A protein has these predicted regions:
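Extracellular glycan-targeting catalytic surfaces
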Residues: 52-220, 226, 250, 293-298, ...
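Long, repeat-rich segments with strong aromatic
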Residues: 239, 243-327
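Bacterial N-terminal signal peptides that target proteins for export
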Residues: 4-7, 15-38
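Glycine-centered signal
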Residues: 10, 14-15, 49
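Bacterial N-terminal signal peptides
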Residues: 36-48
Length: 400
């Protein structure tokens, strides 16, 4: 018995030491686990906060940094902002004298099959859209309730009346003319008097009609695809549908270097005979606007993508040169060019005005300088108020 007790004591001591060792190991493992979980949780929260910060900057097309920058210029009575702002307010005020043109079936025949019918049936959406857009911006700058309410009048009209789109160009026109409704809605997101039922109604219309129209043609590799992707991006930003938003981004990247040649010409658009320069603009305007929306929503910068010399900058330079030297355009004799007297507005000046700060281009600035402030308020809506609302990739630290 005397011999057994020491052995039991020794065994018990070993067991206690082993138990202590095991307990320590478990504690270390649990500590490491908690540290890892805490790190993962921290990363997750930071990601959410980071995304929230991006979205908190404001609308997809007009981030708060941009709005605040312009407010400061207006406060300082700086031109051309003051004059451009007066033009905006005049446009917004004109919306109080017109009724909405929403229709149950937005049916638009093909332009080349029925030009008169196409233009007539498109005009209602174009007038309502620019009215909503200009009023939403006017509210953003002035805080006056009447502008927000007038913008909502047009948004609610389309959300409750319009149920579908049809005919050959219904989806395309809704994409390039209806962008204004989406931008207006995005600007009004923080308007407290936009009731929940009305918001839900507009969300439903955006998802089932507007975005459906855009997504039905976003696979196209020409200007139609460019406009429909912009429309879809704006809808997805408003709906906070990140999955479909990323699908738009994927499509833009997928055919980017198929549509822009190494010398800068737009492969599909120069085929349009006498309208080749116009369609070059008509493709680049929504493409660059899409890049701006992507940058504002995700922080991803696509403006400087380049491959074998092909880039958006080169395409813009190409457009500017041949709009000034149409006699050198090799694809068609006497092509249509954009001027200050153009039917819808001064294209491509509105586009080049918008891009002048993105690419810090004195050529673009010199081209548009005599005509500023520019406003493009008919037909197609990517760069509508380029002088009033300049773009910046550096937080508006340097605007020329």
């Amino acid at each position: 018995m005397k011999n057994i007790l020491p052995l039991l004591f020794i065994s018990s001591s070993k067991l206690m030491r082993q138990k202590t060792t095991i307990t320590s190991a478990v504690r270390i493992a649990l500590t490491r686990y908690h540290v890892c979980m805490l790190a993962a949780l921290t990363f997750f929260l930071l990601t959410i906060l980071s995304n929230a910060e991006v979205n908190a900057k404001g609308a997809a097309m007009h981030p708060e940094e941009q709005i605040n920058f312009v407010k400061q210029q207006l406060k300082n009575k700086k031109e051309p902002y003051v004059k451009a702002f007066k033009m905006l307010i005049k446009k917004a005020d004109s919306s109080f004298h017109v009724s909405h043109h929403a229709v149950e079936d937005f049916g638009v025949p093909g332009f080349y099959q029925d030009k008169e019918g196409h233009q007539r049936l498109s005009l209602g959406l174009q007038r309502d859209g620019i009215s909503a857009y200009s009023c939403a911006l006017a509210w953003k700058f002035t805080g006056k309730k009447k502008y927000a309410e007038r913008a909502l009048y047009f948004l609610n009209s389309w959300a409750t009346v319009n149920k579908k789109y049809s005919q050959l160009d219904g989806s395309l026109v809704m994409s390039y003319s209806g962008t204004t409704l989406m931008i207006a809605a995005d600007l009004l997101k923080d308007y407290k008097n936009w009731t929940t039922p009305d918001r839900e109604s507009f969300n439903l219309w955006t998802r089932n009609v507007f975005r459906h129209a855009a997504n039905s043609i976003r696979f196209r590799n020409n200007n139609s695809g460019d406009w429909s992707r912009l429309a879809s991006l704006l809808a997805n930003a408003f709906l906070d549908d990140q999955e479909d938003f990323q699908e738009d981004v994927r499509l833009i990247k997928k055919d980017f270097f198929n549509k822009i040649a190494e010398d800068g010409h737009m492969v599909e658009e120069v085929k349009r005979e006498g309208n080749g320069i116009w369609y070059t603009y008509f493709s680049l305007a929504p493409l660059t606007a899409s890049m701006w929306v992507i940058y504002n929503e995700s922080g991803e910068n696509l403006f400087f993508m380049e491959k074998n010399g092909a880039s958006v900058k080169k395409a813009l330079d190409y457009l500017l040169y041949y709009n000034q030297h149409p006699q050198e355009w090799k694809y068609f004799k006497n092509p249509r060019v954009g001027t200050v007297n153009s039917q819808y507005g001064f294209w491509p000046a509105n586009l080049l005005d918008a891009m002048s700060n993105i690419y810090d281009s004195n050529d673009y600035r010199q081209y548009v300088a005599p005509y500023r402030p520019l406003m493009y308020v008919q037909h197609d809506y990517a760069w509508t108020f380029p002088t009033l609302l300049p773009l910046s990739l550096d937080g508006y630290k340097e605007i020329k």
